[in-house]
């Protein structure tokens, strides 16, 4: 059984250079898990932050399902705690505070055991000229592939 991707942060790959990836668990309520199974999540403006030595996913939108809980409307952009091993947390803390890097969520998915997981990465912000160079390389690669595809023998 493969992983079931719920939401991806495509903006992160465009705005940041990904250095190292991690897999983290996430603390959710039952209604939020139900919303994730319905693929009602968005990571476009999400980021990670340390609060009192723990890592939290901030500004990630997980929609409220009307069928899940009728009498309580949770905050859809509430901070959600990420679950990592202590050594991983220490490594991330050092990278963020000493090296000036950022932690970016890449995607939310359900793994083989049907647990909700968040793929996070240590990333370095790209400058405008880096983004332009990446776009130019992608267009050149795309043009080369189409030229090879359309080439007749």
Curated annotation (Swiss-Prot):
One of its GO terms (cellular component) is cytosol. Signal peptide: none annotated. It comes from the Bacteria. It is found in: Cytoplasm. Keywords: Cytoplasm, RNA-binding. Coiled coil: none annotated. CDD domains: SmpB. GO terms for biological process: trans-translation. Its main location: cytoplasm. One of its GO terms (molecular function) is RNA binding. Pfam families: SmpB. Belongs to the SmpB family. Required for rescue of stalled ribosomes mediated by trans-translation. Binds to transfer-messenger RNA (tmRNA), required for stable association of tmRNA with ribosomes. tmRNA and SmpB together mimic tRNA shape, replacing the anticodon stem-loop with SmpB. tmRNA is encoded by the ssrA gene; the 2 termini fold to resemble tRNA(Ala) and it encodes a 'tag peptide', a short internal open reading frame. During trans-translation Ala-aminoacylated tmRNA acts like a tRNA, entering the A-site of stalled ribosomes, displacing the stalled mRNA. This is SsrA-binding protein. It comes from Sulfurovum sp. (strain NBC37-1).
């Amino acid at each position: 059984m493969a992983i079931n991707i719920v939401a991806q942060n495509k903006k992160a790959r465009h705005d940041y250079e990904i250095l190292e990836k991690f897999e983290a668990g996430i603390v959710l309520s039952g209604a939020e898990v139900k919303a994730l199974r319905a693929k009602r999540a968005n990571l476009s403006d999400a980021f990670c932050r340390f609060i009192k030595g723990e890592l939290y996913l901030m500004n990630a939108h997980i929609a409220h399902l009307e069928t899940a809980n009728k009498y309580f409307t949770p905050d859809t952009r509430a901070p959600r705690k990420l679950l990592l091993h202590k050594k991983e947390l220490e490594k991330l803390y050092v990278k963020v505070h000493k090296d000036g890097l950022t932690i970016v969520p890449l995607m939310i998915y359900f793994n083989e055991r049907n647990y909700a997981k968040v793929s996070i990465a240590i990333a370095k912000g790209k400058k405008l000229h880096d983004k332009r160079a990446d776009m130019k390389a992608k267009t050149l690669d795309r043009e080369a592939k189409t030229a090879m595809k359309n080439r007749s023998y």
